Design a protein with these regions (language model features):
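N-terminal cap/lid segment of alpha/beta-hydrolase-fold proteins
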Residues: 2-19
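Small/polar loops that bind or transfer phosphate-bearing groups
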Residues: 14, 40, 104
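Active-site loop/oxyanion-hole signature of alpha/beta-hydrolase fold enzymes
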Residues: 63-103
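Conserved HGGG/HGGXW glycine-rich cap/lid loop of the alpha/beta-hydrolase fold
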Residues: 18-74
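Soluble or luminal CAZymes and related metallo-dependent hydrolases
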Residues: 5, 14, 44, 80-84
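Alpha-helical elements of Rossmann-like donor-binding domains used by nucleotide-donor carbohydrate transfer enzymes
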Residues: 8, 47, 51, 83-90
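Short loop/turn positions at the edges of beta-strands in beta-sheet-rich folds
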Residues: 14-16, 29, 96
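Structural motif
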Residues: 5, 27, 54-55, 92-95
Length: 105
């Protein structure tokens, strides 16, 4: 059985001494870069609608993550958009990805 938003395991990746929680599932063989989701300020992975993320995961790989210091990630929460963007880029690189399409609101 394929993973879904609710069944994909929450994994941890360490970046600069802090632990970032993320979930990754979906169609990794689509030939397209993964969709990397950025949640609203201090929101967590579970704030996304599973109907939407699972619908998108049918055609693309989906990656959700918790910002530094939010939900299941450790560290001090960032207060500047620039710092949050830097963290997202570092997590993307730590996951071994050179390209993603970003989804956010």
């Amino acid at each position: 059985m394929a993973d879904t938003h609710l069944t994909a395991p929450t994994r941890i990746i360490e970046v600069e001494g802090d632990r970032f929680a993320y979930r990754r599932w979906g169609n990794s063989g689509s030939g397209q870069p993964p969709l990397f989701f950025l949640q609203h300020f201090r929101g967590g992975m579970d704030h996304w609608d599973p109907l939407m993320t699972d619908g998108l995961a049918a055609g693309r790989e989906v990656i959700l993550y918790d910002y530094r210091g939010c939900a299941s990630s450790t560290g001090v929460p960032r207060t500047l958009i620039e710092d949050m963007a830097d963290d997202a880029a570092k997590v993307i690189r730590a996951l071994g990805l050179s390209r993603v399409d970003v989804v956010g609101f």
